[in-house]
């Protein structure tokens, strides 16, 4: 395996030479013997920023591949005393060893060639990071088991086809979801992922609360705070609901029960999604701490984009309702789609959402949003 060196964050990382694995002039990271995805740099930048808020003394990068994520934690977060890097693939482990050495982390790094679930059941750390190719569902129970009380677990999910209902059978198998596409499916997918995490953690009597959640390109990223106690677990389980939306008029409702719900306006059977987490997707204090710390990381390759995402999330987190998609409501009203910023100005109390370029978050009700869309559309055509 020939290698090339790249720089990411403060780390020097050896990765497989992509030119050796190209097919018909194209390259996919999964074709290389050890996986490295440059499209996930923003994910890793954000993860370093969030972990800097947590300041763990011990952590595990459970599915390490090249080791880039765990190595960056060791180099870019003050106070990390122990970094556990693990991969089940022996080629990956050999590459991790090389990368740990060239970054002078041998005294703090422990490298394993284990099944990640087995390893997680043997350790206790302050911060667990699971970044799989696909679903994190098989690793949730062991991840929460490995996290110390009042510490953190961070997960990535790239199987959005399941979480956003393109594959209803996968949604049921992997996440226990009753899954129908709705106008705000990107938010529901995130809430469905959090719901699965809460129910898995409950098995080991741990209550998990999302302190930061976001969507980018083709994945979700969620950071959970983990606490012990049956009563806390029960409180989190009580925050799981089913969402219903009318495909004809856009009317929405939530219920703690799974049932066939009919729209009170149209008498049509409503689309169903759940169980899904109904509370805030971020902890406001944690988010503000991330924003406050960001300037320390101006060297991030994705600094500008990351700052924009965080500020948008700060704005939208003021609103408890799920986002509304402008083109969906415009199509129901049979009018042209107005610009999002114009809709926000019309509503006054509203913001963009990072989840969807056509989405708005607002305190206003459905009828008020529709009225703004109609009014703006009539101006454009007059």
UniProtKB/Swiss-Prot annotation:
Entry keywords, A to Z: Metal-binding, Methyltransferase, RNA-binding, S-adenosyl-L-methionine, Transferase, tRNA processing, tRNA-binding, Zinc
Pfam hit, one: TRM
Catalyzed reactions per annotation: guanosine(26) in tRNA + 2 S-adenosyl-L-methionine = N(2)-dimethylguanosine(26) in tRNA + 2 S-adenosyl-L-homocysteine + 2 H(+)
BP terms from Gene Ontology: tRNA N2-guanine methylation
Binding site for Zn(2+): 246, 249, 263, 266
NCBIfam families the record matches: PRK04338.1-7 (NF003331)
Name of this chain's protein: tRNA (guanine(26)-N(2))-dimethyltransferase
Origin species: Sulfolobus acidocaldarius (strain ATCC 33909 / DSM 639 / JCM 8929 / NBRC 15157 / NCIMB 11770)
């Amino acid at each position: 395996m020939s290698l090339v060196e790249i720089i990411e964050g403060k780390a020097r990382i050896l990765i497989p030479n992509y030119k050796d694995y190209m097919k018909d002039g194209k390259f996919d990271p999964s074709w290389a013997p050890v996986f490295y995805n440059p499209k996930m740099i923003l994910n890793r930048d954000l993860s370093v920023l969030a972990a800097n808020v947590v300041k763990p003394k011990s952590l595990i990068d459970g599915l390490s591949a090249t080791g880039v994520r765990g190595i960056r934690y060791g180099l870019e977060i003050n106070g990390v005393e122990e970094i556990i890097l693990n991969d089940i693939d022996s080629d990956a482990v050999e590459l991790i060893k090389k990368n740990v050495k060239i970054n002078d982390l041998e005294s703090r790094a422990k490298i394993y060639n284990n099944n990640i679930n087995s390893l997680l059941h043997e350790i206790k750390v302050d911060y667990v990071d699971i970044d799989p190719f696909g679903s994190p569902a098989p690793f949730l129970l062991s991840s929460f088991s490995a996290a110390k009380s009042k510490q953190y677990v961070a997960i990535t999910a790239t199987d959005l086809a399941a979480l956003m209902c393109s594959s209803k059978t996968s949604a049921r198998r992997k996440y226990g979801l009753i899954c129908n596409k709705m106008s705000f499916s990107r938010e529901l997918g995130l809430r469905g992922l959090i719901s699965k995490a809460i129910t898995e953690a409950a098995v080991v009597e741990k209550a998990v609360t999302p302190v930061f959640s976001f969507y980018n390109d083709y994945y979700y990223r969620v950071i959970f705070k983990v606490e012990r106690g049956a009563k806390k677990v029960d409180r989190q389980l009580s925050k799981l609901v089913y969402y219903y939306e009318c495909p004809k008029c856009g009317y929405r409702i939530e219920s703690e029960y799974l049932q066939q719900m009919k729209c009170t306006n149209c008498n049509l059977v409503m689309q169903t999604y759940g169980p899904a987490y109904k509370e805030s997707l971020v902890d406001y204090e944690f988010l503000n701490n991330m924003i406050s710390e960001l300037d320390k990381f101006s060297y991030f390759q994705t600094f500008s984009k990351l700052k924009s995402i965080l500020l948008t999330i700060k704005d939208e987190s003021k609103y408890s309702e799920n986002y509304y998609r402008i083109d969906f409501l415009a199509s129901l009203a049979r009018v042209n789609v107005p610009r999002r910023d114009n809709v926000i100005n019309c509503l006054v109390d509203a913001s963009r959402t990072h989840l969807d370029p056509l989405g708005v978050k607002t305190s206003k009700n459905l009828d008020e949003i529709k009225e703004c869309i109609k009014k703006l559309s009539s101006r454009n055509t007059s």
